[in-house]
UniProtKB/Swiss-Prot annotation:
<dbReference type="GO" id="GO:0005886">
    <property type="term" value="C:plasma membrane"/>
</dbReference>
<feature type="compositionally biased region" description="Gly residues">
    <location>
        <begin position="334"/>
        <end position="344"/>
    </location>
</feature>
<dbReference type="GO" id="GO:0071766">
    <property type="term" value="P:Actinobacterium-type cell wall biogenesis"/>
</dbReference>
<dbReference type="GO" id="GO:0051701">
    <property type="term" value="P:biological process involved in interaction with host"/>
</dbReference>
<dbReference type="GO" id="GO:0044315">
    <property type="term" value="P:protein secretion by the type VII secretion system"/>
</dbReference>
<keyword id="KW-0843">Virulence</keyword>
<dbReference type="GO" id="GO:0005576">
    <property type="term" value="C:extracellular region"/>
</dbReference>
<protein>
    <recommendedName>
        <fullName>ESX-1 secretion-associated protein EspA</fullName>
    </recommendedName>
</protein>
<dbReference type="Pfam" id="PF18879">
    <property type="entry name" value="EspA_EspE"/>
</dbReference>
<dbReference type="GO" id="GO:0005615">
    <property type="term" value="C:extracellular space"/>
</dbReference>
<feature type="region of interest" description="Disordered">
    <location>
        <begin position="302"/>
        <end position="392"/>
    </location>
</feature>
<comment type="function">
    <text>Required for secretion of EsxA (ESAT-6) and EsxB (CFP-10) and for virulence. Involved in translocation of bacteria from the host (human) phagolysosome to the host cytoplasm.</text>
</comment>
<keyword id="KW-0964">Secreted</keyword>
<dbReference type="InterPro" id="IPR043796">
    <property type="entry name" value="ESX-1_EspA/EspE-like"/>
</dbReference>
<comment type="subunit">
    <text>Homodimer; disulfide-linked. An artificial EsxB-EsxA heterodimer interacts with EspA.</text>
</comment>
<keyword id="KW-1015">Disulfide bond</keyword>
Length: 392
């Protein structure tokens, strides 16, 4: 048993409490000075990044507002850093103070320990005197240690509360920063999506316009091609209007009571020999237009049959007229399908043949009967004059 049977356990208790206060020198917050320097440098750069007088307008104001928000954010972070440094420093001082108090109490007990040991050598009452001496010193030392520890606990609680406040403020700043960043990112994403949607919309509108133009061009091309094709077929003979053309052609050869395919001319078209087409080489003339009229030929042929052929030039002329009349009669009978002679016309009646005398009241033979009339030049209608000699 130790002679300082009260002081020694007290010193051991103080050493245990001292060990609970940590080993080494408490950190004074020097680890946070580097971050504080970073924040201060960022603040200086942000302050220099504000738009000057050469940049005005809404864009400059918007940039200045964003820059001011960043400055405020870094300024608050720097303030939090300073407060945290101060808090850590205060807590470190409290720990160091508590250590010092415990160290002083321990040293005080160690200082009186030899006295307590010496008192134990007094016979009979030495241990009682030593105990009475050690007890007040140990109680005092433990009171001081208890006070130091209480101070440390209170200081720690205060600093912890301040730390929680700083952490809450830091969380708020970080949340605001994240919200700002998220807002910026959301704005960027929104703007990007808006631009992408606008691009897609414009692209779709452009494709629609291109499709409309393409369909319009193709439709116009087919329309013009179809029109050109119709015009082409319309311009080709026989493809359009063929039926109407054939009907007109067949109508030219139609006759009453006869088929249009028989190829016979209509009887009304032969009413006058002057309307017949010219046939070169017939009778030595230029066509039927050069022949005398049918009435003249009929009269000449009738009178030629009642009288013998005259001699001389007059007879030759009459024969020529008779030959032409026979040719006309043959042509008429072939073209009209009627009786031979004078294009289907009937010869004069027997009454006209039986009349051999006539009294003239006009011309050179006026007032004479059974007289021979002088020759008369008759115009045949085709520009050719025919000498006709009428015999009474």
């Amino acid at each position: 048993m130790s002679r300082a049977f009260i002081i020694d356990p007290t010193i051991s208790a103080i050493d245990g409490l001292y060990d609970l206060l940590g080993i080494g020198i408490p950190n004074q917050g020097g680890i946070l000075y580097s971050s504080l320097e970073y924040f201060e440098k960022a603040l200086e750069e942000l302050a220099a990044a504000f738009p000057g007088d050469g940049w005005l307008g809404s864009a400059a104001d918007k940039y200045a507002g964003k820059n001011r928000n960043h400055v405020n954010f870094f300024q608050e972070l720097a303030d939090l850093d300073r407060q945290l440094i101060s808090l850590i420093h205060d807590q470190a001082n409290a720990v160091q103070t508590t250590r010092d108090i415990l160290e002083g109490a321990k040293k005080g007990l160690e200082f009186v320990r030899p006295v307590a040991v010496d008192l134990t050598y007094i016979p009979v009452v030495g241990h009682a005197l030593s105990a009475a001496f050690q007890a007040p010193f140990c109680a005092g030392a433990m009171a001081v240690v208890g006070g130091a520890l209480a101070y440390l606990v209170v200081k720690t609680l205060i600093n912890a509360t301040q730390l929680l406040k700083l952490l809450a403020k830091l969380a708020e700043l970080v949340a605001a920063a994240i919200a700002d960043i998220i807002s910026d990112v959301a704005d960027i994403i929104k703007g990007t999506l808006g631009e992408v949607w606008e691009f897609i919309t414009n692209a779709l509108n452009g494709l629609k316009e291109l499709w409309d133009k393409l369909t319009g061009w193709v439709t116009g091309l087919f329309s013009r091609g179809w029109s050109n094709l119709e015009s082409f077929f319309a311009g080709v003979p026989g493809l359009t209007g063929a039926t109407s053309g054939l009907s007109q052609v067949t109508g030219l050869f139609g006759a009453a009571g006869l088929s249009a395919s028989s190829g016979l001319a209509h009887a009304d078209s032969l009413a006058s020999s002057a309307s017949l087409p010219a046939l070169a080489g017939i009778g030595g003339g230029s066509g039927f237009g050069g022949l005398p009229s049918l009435a003249q030929v009929h009269a000449a042929s009738t009178r030629q049959a009642l009288r013998p052929r005259a001699d001389g030039p007059v007879g030759a002329a009459a024969e020529q007229v008779g030959g032409q009349s026979q040719l006309v009669s043959a042509q008429g009978s072939q073209g009209m399908g009627g009786p031979v002679g004078m294009g289907g016309m009937h010869p004069s009646s027997g009454a006209s043949k039986g009349t051999t005398t006539k009294k003239y009241s006009e011309g050179a033979a006026a007032g004479t009967e059974d007289a021979e009339r002088a020759p008369v030049e008759a115009d045949a209608g085709g520009g050719q004059k025919v000498l006709v000699r009428n015999v009474v």
